[in-house]
Amino acid sequence: MVQPVFDAAVLSGRADIPSQFIWPEGESPTPDAAEELHVPLIDIGGMLSGDPAAAAEVTRLVGEACERHGFFQVVNHGIDAELLADAHRCVDNFFTMPLPEKQRALRHPGESCGYASSFTGRFASKLPWKETLSFRSCPSDPALVVDYIVATLGEDHRRLGEVYARYCSEMSRLSLEIMEVLGESLGVGRAHYRRFFEGNDSIMRLNYYPPCQRPLETLGTGPHCDPTSLTILHQDNVGGLQVHTEGRWRSIRPRADAFVVNIGDTFMALSNGRYKSCLHRAVVNSRVPRKSLAFFLCPEMDKVVAPPGTLVDAANPRAYPDFTWRSLLDFTQKHYRADMKTLEVFSSWIVQQQQPQPART
């Protein structure tokens, strides 16, 4: 049987769409999503400037948002506007290449890095209408991004690798600053989570959502919670990000000067369930492609994920067992399709794995 191919140049103009992309009624885009979700706008530079009043206000706003739905936006982040523009241009440059060229970086089953489209993965229904390119980023290995891009796509794409190496370095810096805010808001101090993530082993992902002539029947990305620790997203000027909160879907409007930040499952465990990893999705439209840059902060692969002792007491017992990021990543890549219950299902799986197996007779 020939493997189907997601060729955006062909599919984006089709009046019908393959059945694998059609989502059941009740899961497809809904009219209420036109309502905007107003999330706090956090001045991260003000927080770190030493102004006690600014720091207190940022801490309060972040804490309230993370206990409700886990989403906020960050401005005054220090990311150079030209670097952002370069990063978005490189998204265009990569995804408009002929399909065989993109497939040189094809992601293999069970892996989290490489080029992927809807038919690359292990699922056959409710497929996402998108293409992605993902790669690792580690502060301890500055050459990692460039080496990966050159090894998979060729020397001609070295500049693309250099742009994203710079971008990932800035994302790592920003994520550690956000960790200071999260630590302060949880009462464990600025240094706790910053230290935990200083040696991060993170994932950078370029998202490309082609136009779709049946946008009310499919989704760019289905409803899910991020299994990672923290997501820092920069959207282009085409809306599409939606968050499920208070029983309905609402949109976060793009802002060129802001990054959308959301809590992932791993940080929810690190906060002992205090901060929420919230259900979200991406919708598509029939007119123009949508592009976004997503940096997923992750701890080192074998670092034990456990909340600080100050967040655990008789009234707030441990919400999740100890685990490593490697084990959760492996679970979502090989055993489970990430959704709103990933962390709960994974926790049960961990406990089951730790139980002694009955002897065979």
UniProtKB/Swiss-Prot annotation:
The source's superkingdom equals Eukaryota
Catalytic activity as recorded in UniProt: gibberellin A12 + 2 2-oxoglutarate + 3 O2 + H(+) = gibberellin A9 + 2 succinate + 3 CO2 + 2 H2O; gibberellin A53 + 2 2-oxoglutarate + 3 O2 + H(+) = gibberellin A20 + 2 succinate + 3 CO2 + 2 H2O
Top class in the EC scheme: oxidoreductase
Instruction: Please give the Gene3D superfamilies that the UniProt record associates with this protein.
Output: B-lactam Antibiotic, Isopenicillin N Synthase, Chain
Disulfide pairs? none
Q: Which residues form the Fe2OG dioxygenase domain?
A: 199-299
So what EC number does this one have? Answer: 1.14.11.-
The record lists Fe cation as bound by: 224, 226, 280
The tissues where this chain's protein is expressed are given as: Expressed in nodes and the ear of the elongating stem.
Q: Keyword Glycosyltransferase on this protein?
A: no
Is Chaperone a UniProt keyword of this protein?
Answer: no
- Give the residue range of the signal peptide: none
Keywords attached to this Swiss-Prot or TrEMBL record, sorted alphabetically, are: Iron, Metal-binding, Oxidoreductase
Q: Name one GO biological process term.
A: gibberellin biosynthetic process
Co-factor requirement? Fe cation; L-ascorbate
Query: Entry's Pfam families?
Result: 2OG-FeII_Oxy, DIOX_N
**Catalytic-site annotation from UniProt:** 290
GO MF terms listed in the record are: gibberellin 20-oxidase activity; metal ion binding
Family annotation (PANTHER family): 2-OXOGLUTARATE (2OG) AND FE(II)-DEPENDENT OXYGENASE SUPERFAMILY PROTEIN-RELATED (PTHR47990)
Family listed:
Belongs to the iron/ascorbate-dependent oxidoreductase family. GA20OX subfamily.
Write down what this protein is called.
Answer: Gibberellin 20 oxidase 1-D
Q: Which organism is it from?
A: Triticum aestivum
